Curated annotation (Swiss-Prot):
Its EC number is 3.5.1.108. GO terms for molecular function: metal ion binding; UDP-3-O-acyl-N-acetylglucosamine deacetylase activity. Disulfide bonds: none annotated. Its cofactor is Zn(2+). InterPro entries: Ribosomal_Su5_D2-typ_SF, UDP-acyl_GlcNac_deAcase, UDP-acyl_GlcNac_deAcase_C, UDP-acyl_N-AcGlcN_deAcase_N. Keywords: Hydrolase, Lipid A biosynthesis, Lipid biosynthesis, Lipid metabolism, Metal-binding, Zinc. The active site is at residue 264. This is UDP-3-O-acyl-N-acetylglucosamine deacetylase.
C-alpha cells in the first residue's frame, strides 16, 4: 500500500512577502498522519491554525489566500505546489506573518528546503481524490475542468497578447507519468507587467516584487537580465500555480486538468463544484504496484 508522507525533519528559511514586502520566517515541520497541510500563524496571540483546504480559500484576486476565524495566510500556492510535486501529505508550516515568502518566484527554493530535510513515509495508507465524472467551470472565455484519467496530467493554455510571450509557447501539457515536477515545472517563475506592478504598489501591494523574484515585462520585452528558465516559462508557471491550487483539495488528484486562461479564482471554483457533488469523485488508496505511474517512487522519490 502506498503510504502517507511528511518531511523528515524541520527546516527553516526567511523571505519577503510579495505583496506585503515584509520579512517572514517560515518553519516546515513534520505532522501526524491524516492531519493534512496546516499553517500556524505564530505571530497571533492564539497561535492560530489555518488548514490548507479548498473551502478555507477567502480571496483569489492576486494569490490564493486561506483563512480561519479571520486569521489569514496568503500566497500559499507555490509552497503547496512544491508539496504536491514531492508527494507530501502532512505538514505543519509555521510562519510569523500573513504571507508565505515569495522566494525566487517559483517553487525551487521550497523544493530545495524540503529535499535537504528529507521525506519520511508514515504508517498509514495514502489517500487520493480519484475523478469519476468530468467537472467544469467557465467564466466568459475562461475554463477549468477535471476529468477521469488514471494518472495526473495538466493541459494549460494562456492567451497573453505580448511580443515576448508570443515568442514562447502559450500551451503546455505535462503528464507526470512521463515528466518530473522538479525539472519540468518547479523552477518556473511568476510574471507580471511593469504597469500593473506600479498600479499595485499605489494600492499598497506588490511591495516585495522585484526582478529577483518575478519575470517583469514592459510593453515590448522582458526586463530581467536573466534568460528564461524554460522557453515557455510563462505557461509552465501557470501550471505550477494550478498544481498548488488543486492541492487544496487535501489529497493528490488522479485525473486530468484542462484549463484555458484559468487562474486562482476559477481553480477554486472548480474544487468547490467537485466537492458539492460526491458522485464526481471518490477517495481511494492504492497498492504500490497498482498506483498511477505519476505517483510512483520513481516520480516522487524519498529523500533521506
Amino acid at each position: 500500500m502506498m503510504k502517507q508522507r511528511t518531511i523528515a525533519a524541520p527546516v527553516k528559511t526567511v523571505g519577503i512577502g510579495l505583496h506585503s514586502g515584509r520579512k517572514v520566517t517560515i518553519v516546515i515541520k513534520p505532522a501526524p498522519i491524516n492531519s493534512g497541510v496546516q499553517f500556524v500563524r505564530i505571530d497571533t496571540p492564539e497561535q492560530s491554525v489555518v488548514p490548507a483546504t479548498a473551502l478555507a480559500v477567502c480571496d483569489t484576486r492576486l494569490a490564493s489566500v486561506i483563512q480561519k476565524d479571520g486569521v489569514r495566510v496568503s500566497t500559499v500556492e507555490h509552497l503547496l505546489s512544491a508539496c504536491a510535486g514531492l508527494g507530501l501529505d502532512n505538514l505543519l508550516i509555521e510562519l510569523d506573518g500573513e504571507e508565505v515568502p515569495i522566494m525566487d518566484g517559483s517553487a525551487a527554493s521550497f523544493l530545495f528546503l524540503i529535499e535537504s530535510a528529507g521525506i519520511a513515509e508514515q504508517e498509514a495508507p495514502r489517500q487520493f481524490v480519484v475523478i469519476k465524472k468530468a467537472v467544469e467551470v467557465r467564466e466568459g472565455d475562461k475554463l477549468a475542468r477535471l476529468e477521469p484519467f488514471f494518472g495526473f496530467k495538466l493541459d494549460f493554455t494562456i492567451d497573453f497578447k505580448h511580443p515576448a510571450v508570443d515568442k514562447t509557447g502559450q500551451r503546455f501539457i505535462v503528464d507526470f507519468a512521463e515528466h518530473a515536477y522538479r525539472s519540468e515545472i518547479g523552477r518556473a517563475r511568476t510574471f507580471g507587467f511593469a504597469h500593473e506592478v506600479e498600479a499595485l504598489r499605489e494600492m499598497g501591494l506588490a511591495r516585495g516584487g522585484s526582478l529577483d523574484n518575478a519575470i517583469v515585462l514592459d510593453e515590448h520585452r522582458i526586463l530581467n537580465n536573466e534568460e528564461l528558465r524554460y522557453e515557455d516559462e510563462f505557461v509552465r508557471h501557470k501550471i505550477l500555480d494550478a498544481i498548488g491550487d488543486l492541492y487544496l483539495i487535501g489529497h493528490p488528484i488522479v485525473g486530468a486538468y484542462i484549463a484555458e486562461k484559468s487562474g486562482h479564482a476559477l481553480n477554486n471554483a472548480l474544487l468547490r463544484k467537485l466537492l458539492d457533488d460526491p458522485s464526481t469523485y471518490e477517495i481511494s488508496s492504492f497498492a504500490e504496484n497498482k498506483a498511477p505511474a505519476a505517483y510512483s517512487q520513481e516520480n516522487q522519490p524519498l529523500f533521506f
